[in-house]
Amino acid sequence: SDMYSFGL
């Protein structure tokens, strides 16, 4: 859901 979760 954010850039740290790689699109999750």
Swiss-Prot record:
Residues with Leucine amide modification: 8
GO cellular component assignments: extracellular region
UniProt KW Secreted keyword: yes
Keyword annotations of the record: Amidation, Neuropeptide, Secreted
Lineage: Eukaryota, Metazoa, Ecdysozoa, Arthropoda, Crustacea
Job of this protein: May act as a neurotransmitter or neuromodulator.
Disulphide linkage map: none
Subcellular location: Secreted
Protein's GO biological process: neuropeptide signaling pathway
Family statement drawn from the similarity comment of this UniProt entry: Belongs to the allatostatin family.
Protein name in UniProt: Carcinustatin-18
Organism: Carcinus maenas (Common shore crab)
